[in-house]
A protein has these predicted regions:
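Short, well-ordered beta-strand elements within core beta-sheets of diverse protein domains
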Residues: 43-51, 120, 164-167, 236-244, ...
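Glycine-rich cofactor/substrate-binding loops
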Residues: 1-37, 98-99, 282-475
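A helix-coil-helix interface module used to build multimeric assemblies
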Residues: 1-202, 207-211, 275-276, 287, ...
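Charged, flexible cofactor/metal-binding loops and thiol motifs
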Residues: 117-125, 129, 144, 152, ...
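Conserved hydrophobic residue
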Residues: 50-51, 75, 264-265, 380, ...
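Generic, well-ordered alpha-helical scaffold segments in large soluble proteins
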Residues: 41, 62-69, 91, 95, ...
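Alpha-helical coiled-coil oligomerization motifs
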Residues: 140, 144-147, 188-191, 257, ...
Length: 475
């Protein structure tokens, strides 16, 4: 098949080279963005009297027809035509003739590809924002549903201090809030228009980039044409966002895996989100959580891979940069499924609050509160720490816990203990006493939930603004 760029060559492209360099297998998903960009470019060319109005109308009608064919799955993509840009342009020229050949006037595949990816990433940011908000809502709903449940909090995966289950859920809410904030920067940098940069040096045709910018809804235009076609920072930033949100979901998944074991028995995942064993009939496996954990490393790989690709590239465009797309496309798909299915899992799980409380009643998670009790009586904290440590050791040897001791036992340990010590180190008191701003006391966690709803409202407003920009593109 003759190449649209083949005039300089005397030989056809080797089939192996075609297969190796073709990107149509993955960049076809940018067809809507490519067509929107081409329509805007043709409209601008006609406005500037670079092509005729008749050619513009033929181009736009032809592109509309092609989009309809692709939407219906009726468009035959060709590896020989390399990518989505050439596939569409070749079909357009076949359909409308000479006018189709004028579409590429004042444009290079370098700035064409760049503007497609910018628009695609903008759209992906909207999708990611909506998914984060839904996940945050699931966390708040679950924190409210189990608002009175107390669970062990952990350090080093050893029981440490009691916390409200809702406090634990809201910790993940805060992580996702930061993830949403990262999308702000991704969108800001994706919302810069590269079209008009040409191959690298700009255009001699008297194009109107400001007009094209308006048609495609971009907030600004690249100041430098060389930067415009070589910039992939916004892709790296998206992959960084994706890596961090997957890391947060992976940590949650690891906890859900642990909590759902018989050894913990803190939660039960819904049957709809688990799988069985081909040989062991009793098994209920948290495969979804395990896959989220596994796919996190894959997402990290896309980030590191692109950074490694970019680190040695001279300005401006190099074919290496084709490697930006498979990674970000896969990351978008991976984060989409991970967020949506985690939201469903959180909403569907059952929390075994009575068992969590029983675990706390049978261990030493209240030891810090016992030391705090002494410190508030004037005992230096380090001395109080030593006293309580000895008491814990004594209980371990006797096969009991601190709550099993009598007031007389406590007074024998230290004359600073009074009759109120057992109330002071009850599990409920341990939680209620931590009523500082970011603490786990019920009123603090309620404030976190209420603030979370305010944050979600602000995030939804931001998504609406993003959507307005994305949907302003004239197709």
């Amino acid at each position: 098949m003759a190449k649209l760029w083949g005039g300089r060559f005397t030989k056809g492209t080797d089939k192996a080279v075609e297969d190796f360099t073709s990107s149509i297998a993955f960049d076809a998903r940018m067809y809507a963005e490519d067509i929107a960009g081409s329509k805007a470019h043709a409209t601008m060319l006609a406005k500037q009297h670079i092509i005729s109005d008749a050619d513009r109308d033929a181009i736009i009608a032809g592109l509309t027809k092609i989009k309809g064919q692709i939407d219906k799955g009726e468009f035959p993509f060709s590896v020989a035509l390399e990518d989505i840009h050439m596939n569409i342009e070749k079909r357009l020229t076949d359909d409308i003739g000479e006018a189709g050949g004028r579409l590429h006037t004042g444009r290079s595949r370098n700035d064409q590809c760049a503007v497609d990816l910018h628009m695609y990433v903008r759209k992906a940011v909207v999708e990611m924002g909506e998914l984060i908000v839904d996940m945050q809502k699931a966390l708040i709903e679950t924190a409210e549903k189990y608002s009175d449940i107390i669970m062990p909090g952990y350090t080093h995966l050893q029981r440490a201090q009691p916390v409200l289950f809702g406090h634990h859920m809201m910790a993940y809410f805060s992580m996702l809030e930061r993830d949403f904030d990262r999308l702000l920067m991704v969108f800001k940098h994706a919302d810069i228009m590269p079209l008009g940069a040409g191959a690298l040096a700009g255009s001699t045709y008297g194009i109107d980039q400001t007009y094209t910018q308006k048609l495609l809804g971009f907030s600004r235009i690249y100041e430098n044409s060389m930067d415009a076609v070589s910039d992939r920072d916004y892709v790296v930033e998206f992959l960084s966002f994706a890596s961090l949100v997957m890391m947060h979901l992976s940590r949650l998944s690891e906890e859900l895996i642990l909590w759902s074991t018989n050894e913990f028995n803190f939660i039960e995942l819904d049957d709809a989100h688990c799988t069985g064993s081909s040989i062991m009939p009793q098994k209920k496996n948290p495969d979804v959580c395990e896959l989220v954990r596994g796919k996190t490393g894959r997402t990290y790989g896309h980030l590191l891979g692109l950074l490694t690709t970019l680190k040695g590239l001279p300005l401006t465009y190099n074919k290496d940069m084709q490697e930006d797309k498979e990674g970000i496309f896969d990351a978008i798909d991976t984060v989409h499924f991970a967020l949506s299915i985690n939201a469903a899992m959180i909403r569907g799980m059952k929390v075994n609050g009575s068992h969590m409380k029983a675990v706390l009643d049978d261990d030493f998670s209240n030891a810090t509160d016992m030391a705090d009790y002494l410190a508030k009586k004037g005992v230096p904290f380090r001395e109080a720490h030593e006293i309580v440590g000895n008491a814990v050791h004594h209980c371990i040897e006797k096969g009991c816990v601190l709550l099993d001791l009598s007031v007389e036992d406590f007074k024998a340990i230290s004359n600073h203990f009074d009759a109120d010590i057992l109330d002071a180190i009850s599990i409920e008191a341990c939680v209620a006493g931590r009523n500082n701003y970011s603490g786990t006391a019920p009123e603090c966690v309620e404030r976190q939930r209420n603030n979370g709803k305010i944050i979600i409202a602000a995030e939804k407003k931001q998504i609406t603004e993003w959507k307005a920009i994305v949907e302003s593109v004239q197709e």
